[in-house]
Amino acid sequence: MTVSSAPGKVYLFGEHAVVYGEPAVPCAVERRAAVTVEARDDDRIRVEASDLSLDGFTVEYGGTADRRPDVDVPASLLDAATGYIDAAVEQARDAADAPDAGFDVTIESDIPLGAGLGSSAAVVVAGIDAATRELGVELEKTELADRAYRAEYEVQDGEASRADTFCSTMGGAVRIEGDDCRRIDTPNLPFVVGFDGGAGDTGELVAGVRALREEYGFAADTVENIGDIVRRGETLLSAADPGADPTEDLLTELGRLMNFDHGLLEALGVSSRTLDNMVWAAREAGAHGAKLTGAGGGGCIVALDDTRETETALRYTAECENAFRAELDREGVRVEEA
């Protein structure tokens, strides 16, 4: 039996634009998905999902992704527990040259599903890591990140970027631009996350931005402007003292860029009333900046605030189901005690 875990993430800047080759800076945070894998004597896959929502479930099915199990659970849960695990298992089988390997898989996660915190990436990264180790193979992190990206790319019908899976694998803050992925040094960023209890449809939201970008030149310019924000933010981060507490001036400038970024994402149609209300609640509470994180449409916002004010304000905001501090996770994927 092998247990691996991987962190979720927030986007400091750059979601959606990263799909079109612009840079993005996602940051791993201390909310994790853990995947326990135990090899079987046959090629079947048994998936037990818990802590993904209020209801857990267990399914067992043949060793390929050709059939969708007939279980009465939300599609998002089913995709998390079977679609992504199937893709992770196929990558592990390929890496270990064990095409007929079967597994009992248990998923436990404290990352909200579909909320912009990289839940699927964390499950895939941890799943591949645990399954390959269970088969006696230990992957380098760069290969693990690449295989996790390929798994997400398959499940998301070619709409995935490398950002989530690379960030979850490596930990810390990373910079993504096309296939160029690398860690960057940052100070300790004081993230606060607000969750509205919902989840956007990533595929529909990405397709919506694509349609706007193809129809309107100014929408394409908006995507490029998000890339400019990322580059400016990266310049600020590179001049800061890595690992130290950030200065107020740095937080002010980063927050201003986050506010610009949210405005552009809103213009691209990927925000929502609940996300906007949480963003404004955070700003009015004194956050240096706040924006949606992830695909949008519902889910989470991220704010920069080193005080308790933003978290408290979000907890009293009607649209916010949960609010919590999310420290930067510099470790990435790791093996847990079984």
Q: Language-model segments: which ranges?
A:
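Short, Gly/Pro- and small/polar-rich lid/capping loops
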Residues: 1-19
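C-terminal nucleotide
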Residues: 3, 7, 34-83, 90, ...
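Glycine/serine-rich anion-binding loops at beta->alpha junctions
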Residues: 5, 10, 108-131, 287-305
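Short secondary-structure capping/turn segments at boundaries of alpha-helices and beta-strands
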Residues: 13, 21-25, 32-36
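FAD-binding core of FAD-dependent oxidoreductases
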Residues: 17-21, 26-28, 118, 158-171, ...
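Short Gly/aromatic-enriched secondary-structure transition segments
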Residues: 21-29, 49-51, 208
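Gly/Ser-rich oxyanion-binding loop with an adjacent helix/lid
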Residues: 78-183
